[in-house]
């Protein structure tokens, strides 16, 4: 059968929160089958557990934030994206502050950590959410219109369009399509960094956001150009980072999707609305397992091979 996965060994790192600017220690621990991904705020007098669930998202300003009462875990999307890309179902995530560290602004460090810990299969079938009919969410009008859609597809594919009307971004591709039957998450998506604009920093920091942002963990632009001396990692790094985010946001459904995601100018808020809309329309999806690797769509066999 196509089995669930966790990591073999505990792994730990430290970093800063891109929004809080606070130092945080991150510990990733193996978890039993059917646990899912669970975040733990171990810095509090009593540890608070926050399961990685779309319905647990309480804030989507510049990040996906899990919330339980007054307790938050912010900026979960890059780690969730890495877990989705590597096919990891079960994991305990311990944090000593309210934000997952930003690392280099991509998912690459998390991919490295998870692979270093060793990825192992477990004696339990992996469950997938197979989309049976299209689900779409929209907001805005005209040039401000944003939308995101899930539609049936035997595998996992994403297509994304962006429109920032900025010379540095417009000089790159504003559209990308990734089908994991033929594309590699690790090689083609994981290294895409988050990005921001110098002229927005002051306003964001006054809102308690972007306090840990720097050229070390983001692509930063002035009015005309990219300020990072090393330039871009991919020719289409901007739109690929939006795909990276979407993969992480959608993995808050708790299981990998058998579907195609198509979006225009979507972000964390719309992605979360889409995930919730899918869960609410129960005739639009079904849970499936695969008796063997050979039965599963190529998208899941292509990169989830264990050494």
From Swiss-Prot:
Binding site for Zn(2+): 78, 241, 245
Keywords: Hydrolase, Lipid A biosynthesis, Lipid biosynthesis, Lipid metabolism, Metal-binding, Zinc
GO biological process, alphabetically ordered: lipid A biosynthetic process
The protein's Enzyme Commission number: 3.5.1.108
Active site: 268
Keyword Metal-binding tagged: yes
Enzyme class label: hydrolase
Cofactor: Zn(2+)
InterPro entries found in the cross-reference section: Ribosomal_Su5_D2-typ_SF (IPR020568), UDP-acyl_GlcNac_deAcase (IPR004463), UDP-acyl_GlcNac_deAcase_C (IPR011334), UDP-acyl_N-AcGlcN_deAcase_N (IPR015870)
GO annotations of cellular component type: membrane
Entry keyword tRNA processing: no
Pathway involvement of the protein, from the record: Glycolipid biosynthesis; lipid IV(A) biosynthesis; lipid IV(A) from (3R)-3-hydroxytetradecanoyl-[acyl-carrier-protein] and UDP-N-acetyl-alpha-D-glucosamine: step 2/6
GO terms for MF: metal ion binding; UDP-3-O-acyl-N-acetylglucosamine deacetylase activity
Domain of life: Bacteria
Pfam name, any one: LpxC
Function of the protein: Catalyzes the hydrolysis of UDP-3-O-myristoyl-N-acetylglucosamine to form UDP-3-O-myristoylglucosamine and acetate, the committed step in lipid A biosynthesis.
Protein name according to UniProt: UDP-3-O-acyl-N-acetylglucosamine deacetylase
Organism listed in the record: Bordetella avium (strain 197N)
Lineage of producing organism: Bacteria, Pseudomonadati, Pseudomonadota, Betaproteobacteria, Burkholderiales
């Amino acid at each position: 059968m196509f089995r669930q996965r966790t990591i073999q060994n505990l792994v730990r790192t430290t970093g800063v929160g891109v929004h809080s600017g606070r130092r945080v220690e991150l510990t990733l621990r193996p978890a039993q089958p059917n646990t899912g991904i669970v975040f733990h705020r171990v810095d509090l007098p009593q540890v608070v557990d926050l399961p990685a669930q779309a319905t647990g998202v309480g804030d989507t300003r510049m990040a996906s934030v899990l919330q339980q009462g007054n307790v938050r875990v912010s900026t979960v999307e890059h780690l969730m994206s890495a877990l989705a890309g590597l096919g990891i179902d079960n994991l305990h995530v311990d944090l000593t502050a309210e934000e997952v560290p930003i690392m280099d602004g991509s998912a690459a460090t998390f991919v490295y950590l998870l692979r270093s810990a060793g990825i192992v299969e477990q004696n339990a079938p992996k469950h997938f959410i197979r989309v049976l009919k299209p689900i779409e969410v929209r907001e805005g009008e005209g040039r401000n219109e944003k939308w995101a859609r899930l539609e049936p597809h035997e595998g996992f594919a994403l297509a994304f369009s962006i429109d920032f009307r900025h010379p540095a971004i417009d000089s790159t591709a504003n559209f990308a399509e990734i089908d994991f039957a033929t594309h590699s998450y690790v090689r083609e998506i994981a290294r895409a960094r988050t990005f921001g604009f110098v002229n927005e920093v002051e306003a964001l920091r006054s809102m308690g956001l972007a306090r840990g942002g720097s050229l070390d963990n983001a692509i930063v632009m002035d009015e005309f150009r990219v300020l990072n001396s090393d330039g871009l990692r991919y020719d289409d790094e901007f739109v690929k980072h939006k795909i990276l985010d979407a993969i992480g946001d959608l993995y808050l459904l708790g299981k990998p999707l058998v579907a195609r995601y198509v979006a225009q100018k979507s972000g964390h808020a719309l992605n979360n609305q889409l995930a919730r809309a899918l869960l609410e329309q129960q005739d639009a999806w079904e849970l499936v397992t695969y008796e063997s690797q050979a039965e599963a769509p190529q998208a899941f066999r292509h990169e989830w091979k264990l050494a």
